[in-house]
Amino acid sequence: SSIRKFDLARIEEEMVYIAKRCKKSDELIITDLNFGMYQQDVETAKSLANTMQKYNWPIHLSAAAGKNKPDRLIEIASILDGAWIIGSAMESSDTDVLKAIKRGNISKKAFNKVLEHGNNSSPYAQTYTEIILAIPKDSKETHFNSIRYGMKHEAKIIRMFQAILLLGTEMATQKTRDEHELETQYRVIPGSAGLYKFFDEKIPITEIEEIIVGNSTMSFEDYLDCRLMNLIVESFYNNAMFEEIYAFLYEMDILPLDIFVYLKDHPKIYPPKIKQIMDDFIVSNKKNLFKTRKELEDFALNEKTIKKFIDAEIGINEILVGKSSLYSQFESMVELLITSVSGYLRENDKMSACTQHYLNELGRFTVFR
């Protein structure tokens, strides 16, 4: 098979056209799911760098990186001089999971090389990796291990996604569903509900997707536990607000995930408002799911319910709402994190009076900063 490509002259012309007219956005999104795989991408990067230098646009570049071409990715990232945040989607770090989804993943050596370059390129680097929850053969253990793998290789951002069954894909076939005992439910995509007027009639419309919430190796309860961990990682890890605390942990050969597991498994240490946010998060994850498409359509496709979707009373992005709610309790977040670190260290005979004093001071510094 062959890949159709635009010639470089056309690409240059289009970038200049956009740069001259773009006034309200500093970001360019390249809709190539494997940018950096081919030599032409290097030439595109050089052209883009010239455009950036001449027009001071774009400031940021968003593009999904190709896999198993680390040297080329690094070359392109160097050409773009920090404008492109590099990382790689690994879906899972588990070999059996990758085999089940027939995914030729980026090699561990290449993965590490890309992240190392990205992290060394700037003190403010935001390298990333991406993981998908509940795909065939995934389990609570393998999902947590994938998060651990990303942290071990110092990915600054770990993006965790739910598995969507797309019509026409192999994963959505009855054969795959049966083979891996996929448990699925339906939901309205957050922000994808509206009431539209056609002539004299108001028609409620939603966009519905089917997601995997369990399989032969992951129960629904394990799925919810993983979702809670995803909220913790997104809120406590991804935004670099606690990087001094994690730097201290790395010096002790402790990964942030070790602390997050302790935090998740000890709800009795949660400050009251944090406890309520965590509980509401789990409730929302259950409430927004429906066993069948018909059940969801019967519930959603009426004017009263659609207005609730529009007003974000229902059908919310649970991670986004949970994260923003946690940030509104920032001092309590710091208190909980320091308490979790202290508890983990005591549990593993690594605590001392000096360490406890340092942690307390580190917590105060984080709040006052």
Go through each PLM region and give its residues.
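Short alpha-helical segments and helix-capping/turn motifs at coil-helix boundaries
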Residues: 71-74, 143-146, 213
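Flexible glycine/acidic-rich beta-alpha junction loops that bind and position SAM and/or redox cofactors
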Residues: 34, 38-39, 96-102, 133-142, ...
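Conserved SAM/AdoMet-binding glycine-rich loop
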Residues: 8-129, 133-136
